[in-house]
Amino acid sequence: MGLMMTFTPTQKELFNKNIEALSNILLKESLKEIKSSKFELILGKDNLDINLKDTSDNTFLYENVIDELNSMLNTYNDKYLLYPVLYFYGFGNGILFKALLQNKNHQHIVVFEKDIEIIWVIFHILDFSSELQSARLMILNTNKPEIQDYNELCSSKPFFQFSRIYFLELMSHYYERFHEDVLELNKKLVQDFKDSILSHGNDPLDALQGIEQFVYNLPQMITHPSYKELLSKRKGISDTAIIVSTGPSLTKQLPLLKKYASKATIFCADSSYPILAKHNIKPDYVLSLERIPLTSEFFNNDFGEFDKDIVFVLKSYVHPHTTKYLQKNNRNFMLVSTYASFINYLKLDDFGYFNMGFSVANMNFLLAIHLKHKNIVLIGQDLAYAKDGLSHTKDYSNLDKHEGHFQRDKNKYTTQAYGDNGKVESSFVWTLFRHNFEQDVANAKKNYYITTYNCTEGGARIEGTIEKPFLWACENLLDKDLNKPFEKLEPLSLNKQNEFLLKAYYKVYQSIKHCRDFSNKFIKSYKKIKNSFVSLQNSQENEIFIQEIIQDIDKTKTQIDELYNTQKDLMQILGPLLTQFELNLARIYVLNPKTKEDAFNKSILWIKEHLEFMELVYGHIKAQENALIKNILPLEEKLKERKLDKWMERVRK
């Protein structure tokens, strides 16, 4: 039983003022519900001497309030003076936060608290309203973590930009009792920052491959049915989608899938397609998004009549072998685009856009949302190794490529099992896919009122899904035959195709020119800074000279930033480069120089980093120019074949 603490009317007013300023609605509600507390307020002679006694075990929040406050302040004003974001576990008496926020360098302090009675008491004693209102002080309750809260925190500014210097500080020894919660939270934040970094793109070469293959695939995309056509003819014609993945649990679900195939829309992964063909279960859609030639091999086959009425939906980045194999047997395919700056620059809006996630299962899930299904049923979505160490179902064609993976990953990525049956072994990639999936499932429920049923009956738990046997889903969700085959999808008229082919040619040709113009201008800025830097190292420590170089660097960075608005076609390859650079630069930014020599060395380091970055920018834009020149050829051939040469000439002039 908590202590009935008597607060004065002024203190109650203060509590309400703090509550009003809180932006975290769930926390606000929880704090309003508290009527008493196990904590006793202990006030010393000094204004800052505010302690709490936990009457359940007679322990104190602080052993010595003033000493601990001073020691923390000294550490933070020395080592972490320039940190834009600080993270604490435990609210304590809150005085440390008020003191630290006097420093304008600290833009935000994020506080995680498990025992919110502490906040309840302190909110009656001290005024945090302005810090809370401006969001410089942010409080999260670790008992009610919202998946979205953490994702948003870890992917937004400035938290994301400074994620490489993230660390979590315990407010006081009292909080060591929650060590499991602390470890869990820390693991979650580190993982969310990693996911965020990956979603920003961590590899410019990956982006380059995407651009190359997208440009190469343009003629195929424009001459086949569009995404707009798919939505206009197929949206809302079925309530339940079944998504078929290739996990070890798939085999046992195939007989039921065959029995109920006519009553649901079946989406399947490229890897499950040959398996369904073998069992003569016709999917409605087969999706593929990988850029590698190995994935194209799932289509290096001929299932004859079986393929009639299946629509193959490909991300417009796929390896050209994929379309080559599909064309060989006259299969119906379409290329669909995701949001990406080079793709958006071409403005071929009929052929996009939807976000496709990291894996083909995510892509299936997201397409099922856009086609307005009310229920989404997952099967074969293990995202974990089977007990015998198998990574996929036994019919999977690339099983040999995963040999030894179970041993490699053992005990590194364990996670909660489906049906709460203990733990299962997962992998780095599956963990990433699972987190991605959990975000999608939460989003589908919140924004589209879609229910996701995980009927895998094995593998890893996917938070947010309802776990049910596949038989239950079939009997309860699938009651009538759908009108299959669905309406046929048609390509655009020949005139419209020609218009888009020319438009695409014009845009790609312009982008080659953008690369050249940018490189020529950029190399001049680079040489100027490089020469100044060489002179600087030979001169005496010249502060004015350093400032001039840093100003030149800032101008050049502004030049790159402006591309976001003026030349989006260059940002797809520069985006990941810029992200990785900024994340690493944060480590130099927060160095706190104590002497003149320290300050000089910090500036030298800052300039060196930027020079290396500029060399990379130049190299990548050159690589894009060459890639476009090489991959525009299929587009040129298609235009010649359609006797549009003279228009091509006009574009080139």
Predicted region positions:
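N-terminal donor/sugar-recognition subdomains of glycan-related enzymes
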Residues: 2-241, 248-265, 274-278, 285, ...
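Proline-aspartate-enriched helix->loop->beta-strand connector
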Residues: 106, 283, 373-376
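Catalytic or ion-translocation cores adjacent to nucleophile or general acid/base/metal-coordination motifs
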Residues: 263-273, 278-325, 337-339, 346-347, ...
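Active-site/ligand-binding-proximal alpha/beta "capping" segment
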Residues: 320-379, 383
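Generic beta-sheet signal
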Residues: 112-114, 142, 269, 289, ...
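Short, conserved catalytic/metal-binding motifs centered on acidic residues
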Residues: 245, 276, 378-380
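Catalytic cores of enzyme domains
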Residues: 355, 364-442, 448-449, 455-472
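Alpha-helix capping and helix-loop boundary segments enriched in small/acidic/polar residues
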Residues: 244, 260-263, 267, 289, ...
